Regions:
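Soluble or luminal CAZymes and related metallo-dependent hydrolases
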Residues: 48-52, 98-101, 165-170, 215-222, ...
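Short, polar loop/linker segments at the starts of domains and inter-domain junctions
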Residues: 38-53, 320-323, 468-486
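Conserved alpha/beta catalytic core and glycan-binding cleft of carbohydrate-active enzymes
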Residues: 182-184, 199-367, 372, 393-450, ...
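Catalytic cores of secreted or luminal carbohydrate-active enzymes
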Residues: 377-398
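Substrate-binding/active-site clefts of carbohydrate-active enzymes
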Residues: 9, 14-25, 31-215, 496
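C-terminal beta-strand-rich structural cap/linker in extracellular carbohydrate-active enzymes
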Residues: 477-507
């Protein structure tokens, strides 16, 4: 029985606006099993959907995130797959309660003004006998040729996208989550593995397509069909691709030759940004191009910047320990990274625990180390992320033109030695413009001069070095000194004090 009396009509009425590409997107990625447990020492204990309603919904609202992304809730036999080896494409996992309990959780997020994105895996399925593999004793759902049908990375099987029945099964599953569970978006997992016949395969392990290429023509047609059907029937939702290659037009409409997704994860930004921030600050001057590079291809797609679960597992170390320096510098660097992320164009995605500087890699068997919030450094980092979420919501320049070319402008990329970087974010109204100044070294820079067009009066709206964020609180800009240097171009010189390893945002 799937009957439920929904009470989220206000959200559903407005969600086209909340899910639009010119709306703020800050997404909190959550694994329900391990966010918080009723008994942190018992790895078999789970909070129910009803308990999550009491615990998770108020937390996400208080933090200011616009959306939550749930790692796969579709039924799956093995906890250790994190949900990515699903067997029930039409069922939320019964670990936490009934389908109606899950509907009530989605409804609670909607009533709190928070969108719900579901991780969805149409790329492969496990070989469990009670699942889809050899469903009727033959290769029903998977390709019979194991060069196409077997996934070496995950020891799983790949859907046969050539079969109309299989395509119908998967598209029906996507529609089911939008229709029955009021999902606001699907984050489609491992799209690259669907697109490429030679994904994770060496020569001889794959066969080219009929044109001699490495693209899976049937999977490409399925993806286009999926997105066309979704946006035709649910025009106010989003589909988001996790796609790690440079496949063109992933988030371009199908009529323009694209795959038709609404957004795509910006894996290149994530790799370059983490590589840069891992560097000792003295080395950063030699790697400033990494910063400029993201904007060289940013407008190719509608990008979302992901700091996801994949970056804090398998020995990659938690975010705080990726940062160089002593304890204070690690936290200052991480606040600086998050400030850069939240002022860079595009959607944002942050995995649970990243917001307060978890000191351990994520482990699906245990809850997050919430006891860290007893330490001012972690508690104040969380406050900083909260304020960045609200800065994003409250400043139109950070989202109105996030996918439009004139929404961003480099102001200063020339001071490599000092590693000071300045850019402008533009809204529809010029008075909403923001100047973002990032100081990537542990050196305070007083009276730093910035030359920019605009107005005579600027005020500081964010400073990552405030005492309330565990910063020094010594360097701030109540009223920057501004003077007109060129009347014709309305060019102003703005004097700013820059904190060590700090970000300053002026309006």
């Amino acid at each position: 029985d799937m009957h439920y009396e929904w009470q989220d009509e206000n959200w559903m009425k407005d969600r086209k606006k909340n899910n639009a590409l010119d709306a703020p997107w800050s997404v909190y990625e959550v694994h329900l099993n391990s966010w918080m447990r009723p008994d942190k020492n018992d790895e078999e204990s789970y909070n129910s959907y009803a308990q999550m309603q009491e615990l998770l919904v108020p937390y996400v609202k208080e933090m200011g995130f616009t959306h939550i992304e749930l790692m796969p809730v579709m039924e799956h036999p093995f906890d250790g797959s994190w949900g990515y080896q699903g067997t029930g494409f039409f069922a939320p996992t019964s670990r936490f309660g009934s389908p109606q309990d899950f509907m009530k959780l989605v409804e609670a997020f909607h009533q709190a003004g928070i969108g719900v994105i579901l991780d969805w895996v149409p790329s492969h399925f496990p070989y469990d006998a009670h699942g889809l593999f050899m469903f009727d004793g033959t290769h029903t759902y998977e390709y019979a040729d194991m060069r196409k049908g077997y996934h070496p990375d995950w020891n799983s099987y790949i859907f046969n996208y050539k079969r109309g029945e299989v395509k119908s099964f998967l598209i029906s599953s996507a529609r089911f989550w939008f229709d029955k569970f009021h999902a606001d978006g699907l984050r489609v997992d491992a799209v690259s593995s669907m697109l490429k016949l030679n994904y994770s395969r060496t020569e001889g392990q794959w066969e080219p397509n009929e044109f001699g290429g490495d693209g899976n023509i049937e999977a490409i047609a399925f993806i286009k069909d999926l997105n066309e059907t979704t946006f035709r029937d649910f025009p106010d939702v989003q589909t988001i691709a996790e796609e790690s290659t440079d496949w063109p037009g992933v988030s371009k409409p199908t009529f323009a030759g694209g795959l038709g997704f609404g957004m795509k994860w910006m894996m290149g930004w994530m790799h370059d940004t983490l590589d840069y921030f891992k560097l000792d600050p003295i080395e950063r001057q030699h790697h400033q191009d990494k910063f400029a590079f993201s904007m060289m291809y940013y407008y190719d797609e509608n990008f979302m910047l992901p700091l996801s679960h994949d970056e804090v597992v398998h020995g990659k170390s938690p975010m705080i320990y990726k940062m160089p320096g002593d304890d204070w510098q690690k936290f200052a660097n991480l606040r600086l990274l998050y400030s850069y992320m939240f002022t860079h164009p595009g959607g944002k995605l942050l995995f649970m625990g990243n917001e307060f500087g978890s000191t351990t890699e994520w482990n699906y068997k245990s809850e997050l180390p919430w006891e860290l919030l007893q330490h001012p450094s972690h508690k104040m980092l969380k406050d900083c992320v909260r304020d960045l979420c609200f800065l994003l919501r409250n400043e139109p320049a950070l989202y109105e033109k996030q996918f439009v070319q004139d929404g961003f402008e480099w102001i200063d990329l020339n001071h490599r030695q000092e590693s000071v970087i300045v850019y402008r974010r533009k809204g529809i109204l010029p008075e909403n413009d923001l100047l973002v100044i990032l100081n990537m070294t542990p050196v305070v820079r007083n009276d730093w001069k910035i030359y920019a067009q605009g107005k005579e009066t600027w005020k500081e709206v964010f400073n990552s070095d405030e005492k309330k964020y565990w910063g020094t609180g010594d360097v701030f800009n109540p009223a920057p000194v501004v003077k007109l240097v060129d009347k014709n171009t309305q060019q102003y010189e703005i004097n700013v004090h820059l904190p060590a390893l700090g970000a300053v945002v002026l309006k």
